[in-house]
Amino acid sequence: MSWLDKIVPSMSRTQRADRRKSVPDGLWRKCPNCEAVLYLPELERHQSVCPKCDHHLRLTARKRLNWFLDTEGREEIAADLQPVDRLKFRDSKKYKDRLAAAQKETDENDALIAMRGKLDGLPVVAVAFEFSFMGGSMGAVVGEKFVRAATQAREEGVPLVCFAASGGARMQEALFSLMQMAKTSAALEKLKQEGVPYISVLTDPVFGGVSASLAMLGDINVAEPNALIGFAGPRVIEQTVREQLPEGFQRSEFLLEHGTVDMIVHRHDMRERLGSVMRKLTHQPHQDRDAEPDDTASQSTLDEFSQADH
């Protein structure tokens, strides 16, 4: 082998290594559905919807609310609330250590963000679960933030919208967590008594105590495409009943077919569609009178709520 043959492969390896070093980390993400490798800035422009197969990837709570609400006038609700390890709980790790790790990973205090703002000029209060924070589990802070958001919506007479993404109640808070199911449900009952609309948007995934309480109590329940929604997971159910579940069981399309949700809305259409529904429920004129929105919510559902309001 000549001296040139010895040098050239070494130079090629060095150049390849330099190129790899010049590419920043976190620029690419693989679609869990079609496995296409996606350029992250492009994916974010598509609101985390795969441009190849239209799969809805999970979206952080803050990005979701910043995208959903108008840019001007957003105001966070109860941003200063911090979780407390009252029980000194420990499983394989201390609860306080899990909280610290989740806060560092997500840069959020807990698994729910609440904001007051506008949707195409219509005042609204919106909350969103952060699934990356301990699986979006509901503890005392999540419940308190939700109740404060519902209270503000009731006092101001503006619609409340919830984007749910949760594994359920937070086991590290035991009964303090389970109490939030009743607490949030009671807040929504007060909202209903005042005739204030509550729209629940079910995103992937929604399970456990969250699905058994606030997530399924919407005046209109909306789901994103192919979202996994239920109480217990499909594997748990199969092991319990010892039967094979139907294809697509617990997916939003299956739930729509069986009447559990009222409509499925693509993420790109969410602002327009929910804005249209809320304007109907609050008897507000549409922004664009010439373009009638394509609502798939049954008119009877909207009429029932309007009649209950009177």
From Swiss-Prot:
Known cofactor(s):
Zn(2+)
Which domain of life does the protein's organism represent?
Answer: Bacteria
What Gene3D superfamilies does UniProt report for this protein, alphabetically?
Answer: 2-enoyl-CoA Hydratase, Chain A, domain 1 (3.90.226.10)
Q: Which GO terms describe its cellular component?
A: acetate CoA-transferase complex
One GO term (biological process): fatty acid biosynthetic process
Q: Which Pfam families match?
A: Carboxyl_trans, Zn_ribbon_ACC
Q: Which UniProt keywords apply?
A: ATP-binding, Cytoplasm, Fatty acid biosynthesis, Fatty acid metabolism, Lipid biosynthesis, Lipid metabolism, Metal-binding, Nucleotide-binding, Transferase, Zinc, Zinc-finger
Q: How is the cofactor bound?
A: Binds 1 zinc ion per subunit.
What is this protein's name?
A: Acetyl-coenzyme A carboxylase carboxyl transferase subunit beta
What organism, scientifically named, is this protein from?
Answer: Chromohalobacter salexigens (strain ATCC BAA-138 / DSM 3043 / CIP 106854 / NCIMB 13768 / 1H11)
Taxonomic lineage of the native organism = Bacteria, Pseudomonadati, Pseudomonadota, Gammaproteobacteria, Oceanospirillales
